[in-house]
């Protein structure tokens, strides 16, 4: 029986400084809204917002098929290279490691679609941190999505004690 039978959502914030990674993630099976979003996202680029396949290396896309999209406008070539280089590699490796480790069942990988929203700060400079943090945040997002975490009861319980690092009163 399939483990991932519906669209699931994951989120994670990892790292610090301008290289912080904040991932918003959707995973779902063939025939689901995740597949539709994947196809639409791949062909509907807008100025400053570009979607791209997550590839481990050129000619080696990760499986499940994974589409990355930027969450803030890409303003210059440096920021584009960070998205198409360290962030892309980190995301792709996280997806493939999730398959290798059984988080995503290998027998389902060819029939799933993953969409990953990536944040690249306009002043990010350390490519190694960008790659590392995006890897960690993507993998954590996948784990949370596949496991249906956090549960509504946990969010409700922690809603007043949790702190948001960018909130007005942080």
From Swiss-Prot:
Enzymatic reactions = 5,6,7,8-tetrahydromethanopterin + formaldehyde = 5,10-methylenetetrahydromethanopterin + H2O
Signal peptide range: none
The answer to whether keyword Cytoplasm applies is: yes
Note the pH dependence of activity: Optimum pH is 7-7.5.
EC number(s) per entry: 4.2.1.147
Tell me the compartments it is located in: Cytoplasm
Recorded GO CC terms:
cytoplasm
Pathway, per Swiss-Prot/TrEMBL?
A: One-carbon metabolism; formaldehyde degradation; formate from formaldehyde (H(4)MPT route): step 1/5
Q: What are the catalytic residues?
A: 22 (proton donor)
Q: What happens when the gene is disrupted?
A: Cells lacking this gene are unable to grow on methanol but exhibit wild-type growth on succinate. In addition, mutant is shown to be formaldehyde sensitive.
Q: Which residues bind substrate?
A: 24, 53, 71, 73, 88
Query: Endoplasmic reticulum as a keyword?
Result: no
Q: One MF term from GO for this chain?
A: carbon-nitrogen lyase activity
Q: Which GO terms describe its biological process?
A: carbohydrate biosynthetic process; formaldehyde catabolic process; one-carbon metabolic process
Q: What keywords sit in the KW lines? A: Cytoplasm, Detoxification, Lyase, One-carbon metabolism
Q: Which Pfam families would you find in this protein's record?
A: Fae
Q: How is the activity of this protein regulated?
A: Inhibited by the addition of an excess of H4F.
- Family as reported in the entry's similarity comment: Belongs to the formaldehyde-activating enzyme family.
Q: How does it assemble?
A: Homopentamer.
Role according to the record: Catalyzes the condensation of formaldehyde with tetrahydromethanopterin (H(4)MPT) to 5,10-methylenetetrahydromethanopterin, a reaction which also proceeds spontaneously, but at a lower rate than that of the enzyme-catalyzed reaction. Is an essential enzyme for methylotrophic energy metabolism and formaldehyde detoxification of this bacterium.
Q: What is this protein called?
A: 5,6,7,8-tetrahydromethanopterin hydro-lyase
Q: Which organism is this entry from?
A: Methylorubrum extorquens (strain ATCC 14718 / DSM 1338 / JCM 2805 / NCIMB 9133 / AM1) (Methylobacterium extorquens)
What gene name is given for the protein in this entry?
fae
């Amino acid at each position: 029986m399939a483990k991932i039978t519906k669209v699931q959502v994951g989120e994670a914030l990892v790292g610090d400084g301008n290289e912080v990674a904040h991932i918003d993630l959707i995973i779902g099976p063939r025939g689901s809204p995740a597949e539709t979003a994947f196809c639409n996202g791949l062909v509907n680029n807008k100025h400053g917002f570009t979607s791209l396949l997550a590839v481990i290396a050129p000619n080696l896309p990760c499986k499940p098929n994974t589409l990355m999209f930027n969450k803030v406008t890409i303003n210059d070539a440096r920021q584009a290279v960070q998205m198409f280089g360290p962030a892309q590699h980190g995301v792709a490796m996280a997806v493939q490691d999730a398959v290798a480790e059984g988080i995503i069942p290998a027998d389902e990988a060819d029939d799933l679609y993953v969409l990953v929203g990536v944040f690249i700060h306009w002043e990010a400079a350390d490519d190694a941190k960008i790659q590392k943090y995006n890897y960690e945040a993507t993998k954590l997002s996948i784990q949370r999505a596949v496991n249906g975490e956090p549960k509504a009861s946990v969010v409700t319980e922690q809603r007043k004690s949790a702190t948001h690092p960018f909130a007005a009163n942080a």
